[in-house]
């Protein structure tokens, strides 16, 4: 048994411009080397570009992209008798959201082209249209979980 206490879930403050905790989560995921103002600039520039294209609330498009890129199942490793099994488990909503954000930002950074805000905009638009690399990553995780469905009876 662990002697440490379970970490309390931190409350994320709302974004000052969009009044949304989702926007704050995206900014915190973009964040590199503690440069939060740069991360905020990238996010707001991305949202402005999406607003210009679709002429509607960019947070709705972001929510749709996150919904399309968040996995419902994933595999976790479990060691039983010297053998490590990939056990499929359901993903909770918060973890699904953070995984989707991770996939979208990771795949946006891998894209070719100039300017992270442009690459992030394109990845968000692709994910909202159910295409793009982030959605492919989600489908890949689902395939892995489906392949290991035989081990789903092992409790985690």
Swiss-Prot record:
GO BP terms: translation
Function: One of the primary rRNA binding proteins, it binds directly to 16S rRNA where it nucleates assembly of the head domain of the 30S subunit.
GO function term, MF aspect, one: structural constituent of ribosome
Location in or out of the cell: Plastid, Chloroplast
A Pfam family: Ribosomal_S7
Record-stated family: Belongs to the universal ribosomal protein uS7 family.
Quaternary context: Part of the 30S ribosomal subunit.
Protein name: Small ribosomal subunit protein uS7c
